[in-house]
Amino acid sequence: MSEMKKTLVSGLPQLGLELTEETCDTLCAFGVAMVKQNEVMNLTGITDDRGVAKAHLLDSLTVMACADLTGKTLIDVGCGAGFPGVPLAIASGAKVTLLDSLGKRMKWLETVLPQLGIDAECVTARAEEAVAAR
């Protein structure tokens, strides 16, 4: 088991969360993909396995300790590398929209999410433009 997965799995009880093995694997696969992409595009300063699990994955999941998101619709405005939106899309049962103005980041998310079987809508726009368009 990777250090990222060990850290993720050991941190879940502290949040009062239980996730399936498959969900944990998908979360870690996204973390690994983000670290790999970070080699060519500045996505994060946190790239070690434990740091990614704690500062990106577990921190993103903390909202699930406070609210049942199953069937809810969420938008992650200024999603950057996909946190907290992508982990919530993976683990919560919510329909998630990722919104960011930086096209390079969104193009990467549009590519990697389907590869990992992650269902989230990606919208490249500034928040005020997205609101005006609706």
Question: What positions do the PLM features span?
Answer:
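Class I SAM-dependent transferase core
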Residues: 2-71, 75, 105-107, 111-119
